């Protein structure tokens, strides 16, 4: 929802004034300044008045209020214009720029920083690390450039003494991916001299006030500002900037940006070398010029990583090449001082340009492929020096004010002139609005052959000694009739102008008197080649790379370089062309007073700025004109989805008719005009409403496209999956067939083999058939087993099954299972085993068969048993398919105990060769015995007993638990005990003895 300011703050947009007049404009501007509302709109132009105090209107909360909002929805603010430029760039994939203009001290630099801060804050919602790194470096670059390029002037404590234009590159998602900085005309003369009340660049004061004692000692510096000739003028001046604190901020910023420690140290060394250069004094001894303090030369040589004698020679001599001859021409004292100052200025300028270049290298767009990432778009931010009128205006002010004339001309061309011409060209009814066109002043300065710069260049190229006075005379003769140029010679009664020194230009911002003193010298920008060779031969690679032209041979003839004014003019023309190619947004900064006071609003001072900035004319054009215009084709391409008559394609006679239909459908026909090739929309609100309708339709279109595309993807995915499954199925079938064919080939004729194919190696199956191979091998093994079983007599099959059962239960857990011998089972009836008693046992067995009706005898054997009273006796066990009988062989095999097999829960045997076995019963009355044989002795029968019992239980589909352990756990009438087995050498036969935990079975040793 739109939020409007209360009327007590005046009109938030000058376009809304009741009458367009200077008094009402100024009254509204004053009211808003006094109420703390420093920003006011003129349509899409922001007028900013410097408050000269900190305001709490730039925090995160304020950023969120303006993020993604339209201009009319929020009160005027820099963030509103920044968001508008960002949205235009993102919506239309069109490069935009924000031009910040105004005179020195009007707040341009601060405005540019807040705009950068806003753009950084609203981008990269996904918090990508690389984007955050780029944003951080873009923001940090500001304070580094301010330290080396800004200075305190009489009008501004943080005045930009260079021009800066920064391009911020964005990817197709609108996130910053890099940038590039262009710098213009650093005021390097400030290095060696400043006007009263002003300082040199901040960097010198920050180094001296913020550098550690150890650092200053290494640079041979002391904290006293007044000790250095180049900066002593501003040594006692108070500044709102904390130099010591800023030193640390700048050093940290350089590290964050990516400057290497040795590069940062080189920058400090250059600053120190310049300060020491300023303290160099020259004396004359006869015809010889000497350096007063040779120690300073050594210090400078150390800081610049070169030799002392080379520094001294460069300061005192100039190498002149005449044909093949090379001579050293000694300087006069005046020439040496001039060379020293030129060297100091050049070193600082190279340092500054190198810093800008390094920042550009680091923040440059990397790995950006438009075919992959889409078109990169740009937002340009121009923060350049404002219009300046000082007590003494020299070459630098001339260039700065020319720059402002060019920017004003751009504003006139785009906002006032081109707009009105476009209305007439398109046939839109329009009443012409008069305005001052400063093209005549721009031509006065830059016109080929006739402009001031051309005349200055001609003077510099003349052979012989050319003076500034001669240059002024040339201006008088060639520009004497120009209405915006005058001098004392042309206007003898004007005593403000000095003879042979001053000339006046009537700029759009007011009359400025320039002193020609230094124009020739500053335009030539002479630096002897000796200094360039000196720096190129430095052992410091950073310094060496700053002076590539130093590698030229002494005798090499070079072309005359372009003059400083021409270089600046060319850069300004390129800058304006660059800005004109983008969609511009303007911030017009106004300085309320010259005292830097937050309370004073100087009406006359502000009115003058409003007049020369053309703000009133801007209001008139905006009120009478249209906020937006677009060709019918592009307009239709963007908004056609809003109307059913134009979506997806229209069938009307022309795009113009289609646009009319669309506008009427939306009900905006009263707010538009139709030109020959373009539609014109009067109010921004209509455009914003169109954008909202488009955004709503885009959601529906995107959902529809997503639905169709997802359906298409699903069908494609299904077809691919189905095809893949078909391929997999057929491939698996092929692999199975191949595998089975190979198995069939290898196992062909195994019935005739002696081992029925046991030696045949199985082929390696595919991974998917591993389980199949296991099943197939199991089938083969069962078949092979059946073939082997066929050879076994039927009478031996029960014994075989019992042995198999024993192996399954005991293999790997007991050493001797008795598998190699025949298992008789009923050993009590065997005469070899019991020759004396077998005849007695058989009748007892028959009687039990009659009585208990058992079918088969499973096992019988003599045993030694122990009971719960620790009594050990010889007994026998007789196991049938129904019962387990405990018998006394000494009493003709009298049955002492009968245990039904269904009451048997399991067996426990030890893991040794002993014959211990425990029969576990449900009533916890376990039977503990040790099997023994008489003939042969020590025959192992445990495997046989376990096998026949397990096999019998299996035939009845019951499970018999068999435990193999030592000691063996058992229960005698509910009492838990253990039976452990020990081997003793002198033990004649197995025997049980009592111990604390149960019993010990002692068996004979080997």
Swiss-Prot record:
Please list where the region (Actin-binding) is annotated: 572-594
Gene3D superfamilies xref list: 1.10.10.820, 1.20.5.4820, 1.20.58.530, Kinesin motor domain, Myosin VI head, motor domain, U50 subdomain
GO-annotated biological processes: actin filament organization; actin filament-based movement; early endosome to recycling endosome transport; endocytosis; protein transport
Q: Which residues carry this modification: N-acetylalanine?
A: 2
- Residues in TH1 domain copies: 812-1005
What's an example of a GO molecular-function annotation for this chain?
A: calmodulin binding
Name the SMART domains on file: IQ (SM00015), MYSc (SM00242)
Record's PROSITE patterns?
Answer: IQ, MYOSIN_MOTOR, TH1
Q: Highest taxon of the source?
A: Eukaryota
UniProt modified residues of type Phosphoserine: 200
Q: Where is the Myosin motor domain?
A: 9-695
InterPro entries cross-referenced by the UniProt entry: IQ_motif_EF-hand-BS, Kinesin_motor_dom_sf, Myosin_head_motor_dom-like, Myosin_TH1, MYSc_Myo1, P-loop_NTPase
Q: Which Pfam families match?
A: IQ, Myosin_head, Myosin_TH1
At which positions is ATP bound?
102-109
Subcellular location field? Cytoplasm; Perikaryon; Cell projection, Dendrite; Early endosome
Q: Where is the IQ domain?
A: 699-719, 721-741
Kindly state one GO CC term assigned in the UniProt record.
perikaryon
Question: Chief location of this protein?
Answer: cytoplasm
Sorted alphabetically, which keywords does the UniProt record give? Acetylation, Actin-binding, ATP-binding, Calmodulin-binding, Cell projection, Cytoplasm, Endosome, Motor protein, Myosin, Nucleotide-binding, Phosphoprotein, Protein transport, Repeat, Transport
- Give the modified residues of type Phosphotyrosine: 536
- State the signal peptide span: none
Q: How does it assemble?
A: Interacts (via the two IQ motifs) with calmodulin. Binds an additional calmodulin chain via a third, C-terminal region. Interacts with F-actin.
Instruction: Present the record's domain note.
Output: Binds a calmodulin chain via each of the two IQ domains. IQ domain 1 mediates interaction with calmodulin both in the presence and in the absence of Ca(2+). IQ domain 2 mediates interaction with calmodulin in the presence of Ca(2+).
- Known function: Unconventional myosin that functions as actin-based motor protein with ATPase activity. Plays a role in endosomal protein trafficking, and especially in the transfer of cargo proteins from early to recycling endosomes. Required for normal planar cell polarity in ciliated tracheal cells, for normal rotational polarity of cilia, and for coordinated, unidirectional ciliary movement in the trachea. Required for normal, polarized cilia organization in brain ependymal epithelial cells.
Instruction: Say which family it is in.
Output: Belongs to the TRAFAC class myosin-kinesin ATPase superfamily. Myosin family.
Q: What is this protein called?
A: Unconventional myosin-Id
Q: Which organism is it from?
A: Bos taurus
Give the gene symbol. MYO1D
């Amino acid at each position: 929802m739109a939020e409007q300011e209360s009327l007590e703050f005046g009109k938030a947009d000058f376009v809304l004034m009741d009458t367009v007049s200077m008094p009402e404009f100024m009254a509204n501007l004053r009211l808003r300044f006094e109420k703390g509302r420093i920003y006011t709109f003129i349509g899409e132009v922001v007028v900013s008045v410097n408050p000269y105090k900190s305001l709490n209107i730039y925090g995160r909360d304020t950023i969120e209020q303006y993020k993604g909002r339209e201009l009319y929805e929020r009160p005027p603010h820099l963030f509103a214009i920044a968001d508008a430029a960002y949205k235009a760039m993102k919506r239309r994939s069109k490069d935009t720029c924000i031009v910040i203009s105004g005179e020195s001290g009007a707040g341009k630099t601060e405005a540019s920083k807040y705009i950068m801060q806003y753009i950084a804050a609203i981008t990269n919602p996904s918090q990508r690390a690389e984007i955050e790194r780029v944003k951080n470096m873009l923001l940090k670059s500001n304070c580094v450039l301010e330290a080396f390029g800004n200075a305190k002037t009489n009008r501004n404590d943080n005045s930009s003494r260079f021009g800066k234009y920064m391009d911020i590159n964005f990817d197709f998602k609108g996130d910053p991916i890099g940038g590039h900085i262009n710098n213009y005309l650093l005021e390097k003369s400030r290095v060696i001299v400043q006007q009263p009340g002003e300082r040199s660049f901040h960097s010198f004061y920050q180094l001296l006030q913020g550098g550690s004692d150890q650092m200053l000692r290494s640079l041979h510096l002391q904290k006293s500002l007044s000790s250095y000739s180049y900066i002593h003028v501003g040594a006692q001046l108070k500044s709102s900037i904390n130099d010591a604190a800023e030193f640390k901020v700048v050093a940290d910023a350089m590290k964050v940006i990516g400057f290497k420690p040795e590069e940062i140290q080189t920058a400090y060394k250059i600053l120190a070398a310049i300060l020491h250069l300023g303290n160099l004094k020259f004396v004359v001894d006869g015809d010889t010029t000497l350096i007063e303090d040779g120690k300073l030369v050594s210090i400078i040589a150390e800081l610049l990583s070169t030799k002392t004698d080379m520094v001294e020679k460069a300061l005192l001599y100039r190498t002149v090449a005449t044909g093949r001859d090379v001579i050293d021409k000694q300087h006069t004292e005046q020439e040496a001082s001039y060379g020293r100052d030129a060297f100091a200025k050049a070193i600082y300028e190279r340092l500054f340009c190198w810093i800008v270049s390094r920042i550009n290298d680091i923040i440059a767009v990397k790995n950006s492929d438009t075919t992959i990432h889409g078109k990169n778009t740009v937002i340009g931010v121009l923060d350049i020096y404002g219009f300046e009128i000082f007590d003494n205006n020299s070459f630098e002010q001339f260039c700065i004010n020319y720059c402002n004339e060019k920017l004003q001309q751009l504003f006139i061309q785009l906002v006032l002139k081109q707009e009105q011409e476009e209305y007439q060209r398109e046939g839109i009814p329009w009443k012409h609005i008069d305005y001052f066109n400063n093209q005549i002043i721009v031509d006065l300065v830059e016109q080929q052959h006739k402009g001031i710069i051309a005349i200055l260049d001609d003077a510099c190229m003349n052979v012989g000694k050319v003076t500034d006075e001669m240059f002024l005379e040339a201006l008088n003769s060639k520009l004497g009739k120009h209405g915006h140029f005058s001098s004392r010679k042309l206007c003898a009664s004007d005593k403000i102008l000095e003879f042979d020194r001053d000339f006046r230009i009537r700029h759009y911002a007011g009359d400025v008197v320039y002193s020609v003193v230094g124009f020739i010298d500053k335009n030539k920008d002479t630096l002897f080649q000796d200094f360039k060779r000196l720096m190129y031969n430095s052992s410091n690679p950073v310094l060496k790379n700053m002076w590539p032209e130093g590698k030229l041979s002494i005798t090499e003839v070079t072309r005359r370089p372009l003059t400083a004014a021409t270089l600046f003019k060319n850069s300004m023309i390129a800058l304006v062309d660059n800005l004109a190619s983008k969609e511009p947004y303007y911030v017009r900064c106004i300085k309320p007073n010259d005292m830097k006071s937050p309370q004073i609003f100087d009406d006359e001072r502000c009115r003058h700025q409003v007049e020369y900035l053309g703000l009133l004319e801007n209001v008139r054009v905006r009120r009478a004109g249209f906020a937006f215009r677009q060709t019918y084709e592009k307009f239709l391409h963007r908004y056609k989805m809003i109307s059913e008559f134009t979506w997806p394609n229209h069938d009307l006679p022309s795009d113009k008719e289609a646009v009319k239909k669309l506008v009427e459908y939306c009900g905006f026909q009263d707010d538009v005009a139709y030109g020959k090739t373009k539609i014109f929309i009067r109010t921004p609100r209509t455009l914003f409403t169109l954008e909202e309708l488009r955004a709503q339709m885009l959601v529906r279109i995107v959902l529809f496209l997503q639905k169709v595309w997802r359906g298409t993807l699903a069908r494609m995915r299904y077809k691919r999956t189905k095809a893949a499954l078909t391929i997999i199925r057929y491939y698996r079938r092929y692999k199975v067939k191949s595998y089975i064919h190979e198995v069939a080939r290898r196992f062909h004729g195994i019935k005739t083999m002696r081992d029925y194919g046991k030696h045949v190696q199985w082929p390696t199956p595919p991974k998917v058939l591993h389980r199949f191979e296991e099943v197939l091998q199991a089938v083969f093994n069962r078949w092979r087993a059946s073939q082997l079983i066929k050879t076994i007599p039927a009478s031996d099959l029960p014994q075989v099954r019992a042995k198999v059962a024993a192996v399954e239960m005991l293999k790997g857990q007991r050493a001797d299972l008795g598998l190699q011998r025949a298992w008789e089972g009923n050993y009590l009836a065997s005469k070899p085993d019991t020759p004396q008693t077998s005849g007695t046992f058989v009748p007892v067995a028959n009687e039990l068969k009659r009585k208990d009706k058992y079918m088969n005898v499973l096992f019988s054997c003599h045993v030694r048993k122990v009971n719960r009273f620790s009594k050990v006796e010889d007994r026998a066990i007789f196991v049938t398919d129904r019962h387990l009988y405990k018998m006394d062989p000494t009493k003709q095999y009298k049955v002492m105990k009968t245990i039904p097999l269904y009451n048997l829960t399991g067996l426990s045997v030890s893991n040794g060769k002993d014959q211990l076995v425990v029969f576990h019963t449900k009533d916890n009355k376990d039977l503990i015995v040790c099997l023994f044989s008489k003939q042969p002795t020590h025959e192992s029968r445990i495997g046989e007993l376990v096998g026949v019992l397990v096999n019998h239980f299996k035939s009845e589909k019951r499970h018999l638990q068999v435990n193999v352990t030592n000691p063996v756990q058992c229960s005698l009438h509910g009492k838990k005990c253990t039976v452990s087995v020990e081997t003793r050498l002198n033990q004649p036969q197995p025997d049980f003895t009592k111990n604390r935990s149960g019993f010990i079975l002692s068996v004979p040793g080997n």
